A protein has these predicted regions:
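Intrinsically disordered, low-complexity regulatory regions
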Residues: 1-103
Length: 103
């Protein structure tokens, strides 16, 4: 029997090529993990999270990269978009963790 409430990803009728874009976002995020600065094995983002400032840090970076979008001549606009999406995902995970902690 087909599960109509949870269709396979391929069955969704995407209008804006979201499936491909999600794959590109995943590839971008994967590529960043060998570029992070770390101290004692922790990324700076993890240290910021530990200090209780991750939400503001993510929102600030989302704003920063949104304001930079298309401003630098010769820069790939997608790079700023990828950073925005990555910080949004980190923020979503932080919010999910906060929601789990408040239950």
């Amino acid at each position: 029997m087909r599960d109509v409430y949870n269709p396979p990803l391929d069955m969704n009728k995407y209008k804006f090529n979201e499936k491909e874009k999600i794959g590109k976002v995943r590839d971008y995020i994967d590529s960043t993990y060998d570029k992070h600065y770390s101290h004692g094995g922790e990324q700076a983002t993890e240290v910021i999270k530990g200090s209780g400032h991750l939400e503001g840090f993510c929102i600030g970076n989302i704003i920063k990269y949104a304001q930079r979008y298309g401003k630098k001549v010769g820069e790939d606009k997608n790079n700023n978009l990828m950073k925005i999406v990555h910080y949004a995902i980190i923020l979503m995970e932080e919010q999910d963790g906060n929601d789990r902690g408040s239950r």
